[in-house]
From Swiss-Prot:
The chain crosses the membrane at residues 271-291. It comes from Homo sapiens. This is Leucine-rich repeat-containing protein 19. Residues 25-270 are extracellular. LRR repeats lie at residues 46-71, 72-95, 96-119, 120-143, 145-168. The keyword Transmembrane helix applies. Residues 1-24 form the signal peptide. Expressed in renal collecting duct epithelial cells. Pathogen-recognition receptor which mediates the activation of TRAF2- and TRAF6 NF-kappa-B signaling pathways and induces the expression of pro-inflammatory cytokines. In kidney, prevents infection by uropathogenic bacteria by inducing the production of cytokines, chemokines and antimicrobial substances. In gut, involved in host-microbiota interactions, plays a critical role in promoting the recruitment of immune cells and intestinal inflammation. Glycans are attached at N32, N37, N62, N95, N179, N192, N195, N202, N251, N256. InterPro entries: Cys-rich_flank_reg_C, Leu-rich_rpt, Leu-rich_rpt_typical-subtyp, LRR_dom_sf. It is found in: Membrane.
Length: 370
């Protein structure tokens, strides 16, 4: 009886202590640092903060911000509206496993890396509105297994691939540059077959091509080839055995990027690179030719001269050796007579009648008379 009485007396007290403990565990700690002109996330905030509002500052979410943010692991809500964020880096929120709401609207985000949302297993609401996002890899959202709301309003997105097992309840897509060609077929099929609600459906319009600008992305008609190019449904069996995403999986993300690149137009950077390479090669070839041509010309000219000298020498030797008897037929004469005859051979006298008189003939006649 005494034990029962003691138990009855302490039971209300134990319940009160337990309720206080539960309430303390769910206690919200809010910190508001809006419009403070901060360039970095403060490192002296209470470590038990659960709701942190850093909107309207100059924060960029660089490496220092990421390290400081990891220390606030009890965060359930994080607001970074209208800051200077341009890139969402891998593992930028990796230690915030309790985060449920992330609002990064009205920044200048144009790159979201593959593992930007790693670790956010409990995230339910993601706001990326009014940024400069042009394309999103579908695998970026794979770690967000609890995501229910996605706001992509007011970006530069023209198409969006939706991953399997993406069980959203509300999505906002208006204010983008939607290209309602075949590349949008998968998104349209998902919007029409899933339980997701497209917010502001009537103003989520096509931007391209011009003939489809009067249609919203959920009801735009597609041609028959779009149905054959893109399967109408994707089975979820491929992802049944999907394990929690880790860093090693995202290190091999190049395969996924290759798959998505089939629907993406090639940028102008490749054409520019090819042009630069061709220009460099052509210029190098011209310089090489300009340097080597004079040398090659001199070598060729020298070779021709050498061949010409060899040919003349061979001709002279052939002529000299071909008529050896000619020298023996020459009669032996006095050197003086030879000299006189040589000189007389070239002595010509113009006669009175205009004819040239050769004195060699005269001398020969005189010799006969004598």
């Amino acid at each position: 009886m005494k034990v029962t009485g003691i138990t009855i007396l302490f039971w209300p007290l134990s319940m009160i202590l337990l309720s206080d403990k539960i309430q303390s565990s769910k206690r919200e700690v809010q910190c508001n640092f809006t419009e403070k002109n901060y360039t970095l996330i403060p490192a002296d905030i209470k470590k038990d903060v659960t709701i942190l509002d850093l909107s309207y500052n100059q924060i960029t979410l660089n490496g220092t911000d990421t390290r400081v943010l990891q220390t606030y692991f009890l965060l359930t809500e994080l607001y970074l509206i209208e800051n200077k964020v341009t890139i969402l880096h891998n593992n930028g929120f990796g230690n915030l496993s309790s985060l449920e709401i992330l609002n990064i609207c009205r920044n200048s985000i144009y790159v979201i890396q593959q593992g930007a949302f790693l670790g956010l297993n409990k995230l339910k609401q993601l706001y990326l509105c009014q940024n400069k996002i042009e394309q999103l890899n579908a695998d970026v959202f794979v770690p967000l297994r609890s995501l229910k709301l996605l706001n992509l309003q007011g970006n530069l997105i023209s198409y969006l691939d939706v991953p399997p097992l993406f069980h959203l309840e509300l999505i906002t897509l208006y204010g983008n540059l939607w290209n309602c060609s075949c590349s949008l077929f998968n998104l349209q099929n998902w919007l029409n077959t899933s339980n997701v609600t497209l917010e502001n459906e009537n103003i989520t319009m096509c931007s391209y091509p011009n003939s489809l600008q009067s249609y919203n992305i959920k009801t735009v008609p597609h041609k028959a080839e779009c149905h054959s190019k893109f399967p109408s449904s994707v089975t979820e069996d491929l992802y049944i055995h999907f394990q929690p995403i880790s860093n090693s999986i995202f290190n091999s993300s190049s395969n996924n990027l290759t798959r998505n690149s089939e629907h993406e137009p090639l940028g102008k950077s490749w054409a520019f690179l090819v042009g630069v390479v061709v220009t460099v090669l052509t210029t190098s070839l011209l310089i090489f030719i300009a340097i080597k041509c004079p040398i090659w010309y001199n070598i060729l000219l020298s070779y021709n001269h050498h061949r010409l000298e060899e040919h003349e020498a061979e001709t002279y030797e052939d002529g000299f050796t071909g008529n050896p008897s000619s020298l023996s037929q020459i009669p032996e004469t006095n050197s003086e007579e030879t000299t006189v005859i040589f000189e007389q051979l070239h002595s010509f006298v113009v006669d009175d009648d205009g004819f040239i008189e050769d004195k060699y003939i005269d001398i020969h006649e005189l010799c006969e008379e004598n």
